[in-house]
Swiss-Prot record:
Keywords assigned: Ribonucleoprotein, Ribosomal protein, RNA-binding, rRNA-binding, tRNA-binding
Signal sequence coordinates: none
UniProt-recorded name of the protein: Large ribosomal subunit protein uL16
UniProt family annotation: Belongs to the universal ribosomal protein uL16 family.
Gene Ontology biological process: translation
Keyword hit for Oxidoreductase: no
Xref: InterPro entries: Ribosomal_uL16, Ribosomal_uL16_bact-type, Ribosomal_uL16_CS, Ribosomal_uL16_dom, Ribosomal_uL16_sf
Gene: rplP
Free-text function comment from the UniProt entry: Binds 23S rRNA and is also seen to make contacts with the A and possibly P site tRNAs.
Amino acid sequence: MLQPKRMKFRKMFKGRNRGLANGTEVSFGTFGLKAVGRGRLTARQIESARRAMTRHVKRQGQIWIRVFPDKPITSKPLEVRMGKGKGNVEYWVCQIQPGKVLYEMDGVPESLAREAFALASAKLPIKTTFVTKTVM
């Protein structure tokens, strides 16, 4: 599972997920999976989608993960009264804005990449679209 090795502070404010994304172009591979909606991806969802893609392309080509879960999400245990401080860190998420490239792929035919990204997209809670690298 992806998570930061060290952080200056253990817990974080909830914050808001507004604005536009950085990393909107396919830069490493030839094909990419781009977010259309906004939301947040957990480390488990990122890993699950990666496994689905890797298995479908039978470990040929190369896959890049362009997102990293760097925000801790806390929760309190069940049946605990309010107060007594913020809960413990339960999992890590990555906030996604529209236009962000989530995954990239290279070294496979376009048809295979489309199928792999469709499988990965089914594992994710946000709408995505298939994009290719634009050459100027």
